[in-house]
């Protein structure tokens, strides 16, 4: 008898550990979420500081990993609207426009910049501008996501849910757009159905040393699978 699997993920049955994917214990399917890509790219990388952009009420992505496993010395969380309460005191809250971050933190001020669920809420021109800013802020790595499609029925569906006017969808992103500007993406995993199909995950090693050490090279580019 065949049918759609009611997935049971191994991470729900085992103690927490840094993972680069989760596997269904029933059908063997593999899925990778934002945290999995963070771990994949930074597990062997010394990281002392992280900037999370678009933090909102959910808090920084991979918070437990950064604080308790990587033991970062300083974290920054940036959001123009709201930031989760009761965060670990290691996180400094920056309630501000992310396009002004260079004025506050300065170039090469953090090891890693991450921005998930953020780019799609900027106009495309501002999205590219943010990517340039993030590259200036980071010493080692920038990793972001961008919505490929709307995650709801209308561009303002999130605004109607939580009242945050900045949650309007203003742009959509494709893997090729990142490849054209020299970034790597999750295309290989996306094509296999392992990534969330509504987003592209993209990253750039500002320090090329870590690109070589990660082993993630041209295989993550369209046409090089």
Predicted regions located by residue number:
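Short aromatic-enriched loop/helix-cap "lid" or pocket-rim segments at secondary-structure transitions
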Residues: 88-90, 153-158
């Amino acid at each position: 008898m065949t049918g759609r699997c009611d997935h049971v993920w191994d991470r729900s049955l085992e103690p927490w550990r840094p993972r680069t994917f989760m596997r269904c214990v029933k059908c063997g399917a593999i899925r990778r979420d934002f945290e999995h890509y963070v771990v994949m790219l930074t597990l062997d990388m010394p990281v002392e500081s992280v900037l999370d952009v678009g933090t909102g009420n959910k808090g920084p992505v991979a918070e437990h990993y950064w604080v308790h496993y990587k033991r970062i010395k300083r974290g920054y969380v940036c959001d123009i609207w709201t930031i989760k309460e009761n965060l670990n005191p290691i996180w400094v809250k920056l309630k501000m426009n992310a396009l002004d971050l260079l004025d506050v933190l300065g170039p090469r001020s953090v090891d890693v910049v991450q921005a998930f669920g953020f780019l799609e809420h900027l106009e495309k021109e501002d999205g590219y501008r943010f990517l340039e800013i993030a590259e200036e802020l980071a010493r080692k790595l920038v990793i972001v996501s961008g919505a490929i499609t709307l995650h709801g029925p209308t561009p303002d569906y999130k605004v109607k849910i939580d009242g945050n006017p900045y949650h309007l969808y203003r742009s959509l992103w494709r893997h090729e757009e990142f490849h054209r500007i020299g970034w790597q993406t999750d295309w290989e995993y996306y094509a296999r159905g392992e990534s969330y199909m509504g987003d592209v995950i993209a990253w750039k090693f500002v320090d090329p040393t870590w690109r070589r050490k990660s082993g993630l090279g041209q295989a993550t580019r369209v046409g090089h699978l």
